[in-house]
């Protein structure tokens, strides 16, 4: 993926093959949503100033509609559509013509005006057998057999109990047997679409976080927050969903018992990075994928968010897959190639996928796991705990990234040895 593209990060496979190189998605004018914009207001505005600004926008919009009705040339627009308030960050989306965009850009209350953009989902194909990822989580970075059925995953029996993992994605098949009734439907931002996961990506990610067989935190709850359908979405829907998650965590008093997973990536987009930063300031932990471009993740959103936990992908023998992004912004490496999890299409369906979309939920699951066994009162404490447990200097071809692989710290605790697969 290159400039302006934004997508989910599971890569396609053919049965029996290792990962092919992902084809870059070319960027063109079609990536911009015509006439749709995201407006970020300046920090420090009073409620009265924000209210007055929005009244001004609405009055200008009404005048535009009146002139349009009177026969003036131009395009009829929607005006303000949705409002977002994440901690102290105020934003809104809307439909405006070029003249209104110029007016908004000159407003003393406006920090920035960005065009809305399409996000694209990666195609996926089933590949059988992948059983190494969980064993790696408790192996202290020791290489594990790719296709062995005897890999042990050792973990504390609390296993994420009482913690909530929010999956901003394509939805989740909450009736899948892997979730044992611990998955619920939260928010669906896609108009005229059911909350059903028709693509599979969200169900796969949720299974890696909290599935009874494939999950890192086997007793955690998962919340489906649908911002993607089968193929694409826009920042409008992504921010609406992220805003809903922040509010739901806050209203439910779950800040130190909740984690957000974002297995998505696109070109750097400051409004979304700002939103992730406000979530951090609000006391909420976000885990994000580094991206699948094979490039420096500093140019990707939300990977470039400084206080999100950014996750690159590692293979079973401690090499970086060529698709995984890297760089100083990458905090940690986790299993991200040939990862088996639950899938769409049936309550027992499974699939094997690759990408930093699979790496990120390993760490989101670890966050949920650690929250259930240790008091971690802030995102800073969560990040410190996750990074303090990592094993250094194992990833080959990590470029200039911090070279730290994920580890759940089980040798510090009494452990449970489950049977898998």
From Swiss-Prot:
Q: Keyword annotations for this protein?
A: Glycoprotein, Hydrolase, Protease, Secreted, Serine protease, Signal, Virulence, Zymogen
Say what the protein does. Answer: Secreted subtilisin-like serine protease with keratinolytic activity that contributes to pathogenicity.
Q: Which N-terminal stretch is annotated as signal sequence?
A: 1-16
Gene3D superfamilies assigned: Peptidase S8 propeptide/proteinase inhibitor I9 (3.30.70.80), Peptidase S8/S53 domain (3.40.50.200)
Keyword field contains Glycoprotein? yes
Protein name as it appears in the record: Subtilisin-like protease 2
Which residue positions are annotated as catalytic? Answer: 169, 201, 357
Which terms in the Gene Ontology molecular function aspect does this entry carry? serine-type endopeptidase activity
Q: Which GO biological process entries does UniProt record here?
A: proteolysis
What positions does the record give for glycosylation? 192, 248, 261, 348, 388
The record's Gene Ontology cellular component field reads: extracellular region
Tell whether Glycoprotein is among the UniProt keywords.
yes
InterPro entries given for it?
PCSK9_ProteinaseK-like, Peptidase_S8/S53_dom, Peptidase_S8/S53_dom_sf, Peptidase_S8_Asp-AS, Peptidase_S8_His-AS, Peptidase_S8_Ser-AS, Peptidase_S8_subtilisin-like, Peptidase_S8_subtilisin-rel
Question: Where would you find this protein in the cell?
Answer: Secreted
Q: Which family does it belong to?
A: Belongs to the peptidase S8 family.
Give all residue intervals belonging to the Inhibitor I9 domain: 36-121
Q: List each copy of the Peptidase S8 domain by range.
A: 131-421
- Enzyme Commission identifier(s): 3.4.21.-
Q: Which domain of life is it from?
A: Eukaryota
Q: What is its main location?
A: secreted
Q: Which positions correspond to the propeptide? A: 17-122
């Amino acid at each position: 993926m290159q400039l302006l593209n934004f997508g989910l990060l599971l890569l396609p496979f053919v049965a029996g093959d290792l990962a092919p190189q992902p084809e870059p998605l070319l960027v063109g004018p079609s990536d911009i949503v015509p006439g749709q914009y995201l407006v970020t207001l300046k920090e420090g505005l009073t409620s009265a100033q924000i209210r007055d600004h929005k009244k001004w926008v609405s009055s200008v919009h009404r005048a535009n509609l009146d002139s349009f009705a009177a026969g003036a040339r131009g395009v009829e627009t929607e005006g303000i559509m949705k409002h977002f308030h994440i901690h102290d960050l105020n934003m809104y989306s809307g439909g405006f013509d070029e003249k209104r965009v110029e007016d908004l850009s000159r407003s003393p209350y406006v920090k920035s005006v960005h065009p809305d953009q399409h996000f694209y989902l990666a195609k996926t194909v089933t590949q059988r057998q992948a059983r190494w990822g969980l064993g790696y989580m408790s192996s202290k970075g020791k290489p594990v057999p790719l296709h062995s059925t005897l890999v042990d995953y050792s973990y504390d029996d609390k296993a994420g109990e009482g913690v909530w993992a929010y999956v901003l994605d394509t939805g989740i098949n909450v009736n899948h047997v892997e979730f044992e009734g611990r998955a619920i439907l939260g928010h669906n931002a896609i108009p005229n679409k059911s909350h059903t996961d028709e693509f599979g990506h969200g169900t796969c990610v949720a299974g890696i976080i909290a599935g009874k067989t494939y999950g890192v935190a086997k007793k955690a709850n998962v919340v489906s927050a649908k911002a993607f359908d089968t193929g694409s979405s826009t920042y409008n829907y992504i921010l609406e969903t992220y805003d809903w998650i922040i509010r739901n965590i806050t209203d439910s008093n779950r800040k130190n018992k909740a984690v957000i997973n974002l297995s998505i990536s696109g070109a750097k987009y400051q409004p979304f990075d700002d939103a992730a930063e406000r979530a951090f300031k609000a006391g909420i932990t976000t885990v994000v994928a580094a991206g699948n471009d094979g490039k420096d993740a500093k140019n990707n959103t939300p990977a470039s968010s400084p206080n999100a936990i950014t996750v690159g992908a590692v293979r079973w023998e401690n090499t970086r897959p060529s698709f995984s992004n890297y760089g100083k912004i990458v905090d940690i490496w986790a299993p991200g190639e040939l990862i088996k999890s639950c899938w769409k299409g049936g309550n027992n369906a499974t699939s094997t996928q690759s990408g930093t979309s699979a790496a990120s939920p390993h760490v989101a699951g670890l966050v949920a796991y650690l929250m259930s066994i240790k008091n971690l009162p802030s995102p800073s404490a969560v990040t410190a705990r996750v990074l303090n447990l990592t094993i250094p200097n194992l990833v080959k071809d990590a470029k200039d990234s911090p070279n730290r692989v994920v580890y759940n710290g089980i040798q510090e605790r009494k452990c449970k040895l489950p049977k898998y697969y």
